[in-house]
């Protein structure tokens, strides 16, 4: 029985890539800087001491990071007994965004340039805004700028609740984000507005990767919080991913846990499981692993590393989340049996010690575990697509156009 379990620790980079200078990210290192802060005692909020990741260390995380940066992460166990295959991979996609990273993991790198809304203020074309107001029958809009999603709620959510005007904002990523109150504006109405925005952006040729619904609750600044009902409307990958090939060529099952289905525009997904928060995502993943049959991919995105800690530049929070994941990892490892393979990786970096609030261009870990996987170093992988090619070879799918099988 063949089953592949792919876990994306969203934004868990292990050192800036060779091309990071082009993105202003040379020197960024999500894992390394978190580990440094923990070792120095400056990340003791809600946790304490050096970064403690014994199970990830046994899979080769520390050694993969050392190969990426030349420095072993502070506090991790340099003498861990390695039980998995490990490597570090660089991205060849043109951007450092979520769809690019995930599509490349699935064998389809993004070699074109996404469209971006680059102006910090008055970010969106007036023609686009006018069409959204007219089609969705809106009283107007708020925002129209670059912002962190939590900051903009404290600034504009009260006015949004009074006026019914949705909050439009963007970032350095190829995104059009819409924040609305779940109760006063309504979730269904927000989703409908996002569908309209997706249509207008596509028809207008803006080449924007995602429209993101950002629902929230609360009644005053400091008390507003985003809910788990986020919904991403992505464009479809430009070529068949391993997920689509798994369904088309093998009649296999592809189970999305978390936001995976949204990232791939629902293409190549046979089952969607919603869950919010690391523990809930972990629980849902374990449940799907328990029921997975032959020719199944279970694919989970652990978004909180990125959304709750990376973008918010919260080093102690990120460290605590990694330690939580590591504590629960044995539950996952114990379910990997026979011919199964488990792959742990990331889609980009988001160094919580870095300036700004955006992603960082970094190498990512590729940690592979299974009873038939030979432990040890598998070096530097020149593209995330090596993961997709590995999965294609494992299941006997037709080869992907990019990447080399790792195993």
From Swiss-Prot:
Its EC number is 5.4.2.7. InterPro entries: Alkaline_phosphatase_core_sf, DeoB, Metalloenzyme, Phosphopentomutase_DeoB_cap_sf. It is found in: Cytoplasm. Its cofactor is Mn(2+). It comes from the Bacteria. It catalyses: 2-deoxy-alpha-D-ribose 1-phosphate = 2-deoxy-D-ribose 5-phosphate; alpha-D-ribose 1-phosphate = D-ribose 5-phosphate. Binds 2 manganese ions. Keywords: Cytoplasm, Isomerase, Manganese, Metal-binding. Pathway: Carbohydrate degradation; 2-deoxy-D-ribose 1-phosphate degradation; D-glyceraldehyde 3-phosphate and acetaldehyde from 2-deoxy-alpha-D-ribose 1-phosphate: step 1/2. Mn(2+) 2 binds at residues 306, 311, 359. GO terms for molecular function: magnesium ion binding; manganese ion binding; phosphopentomutase activity. Mn(2+) 1 binds at residues 10, 347-348. One of its GO terms (cellular component) is cytosol. HAMAP family: Phosphopentomut. Belongs to the phosphopentomutase family. This is Phosphopentomutase.
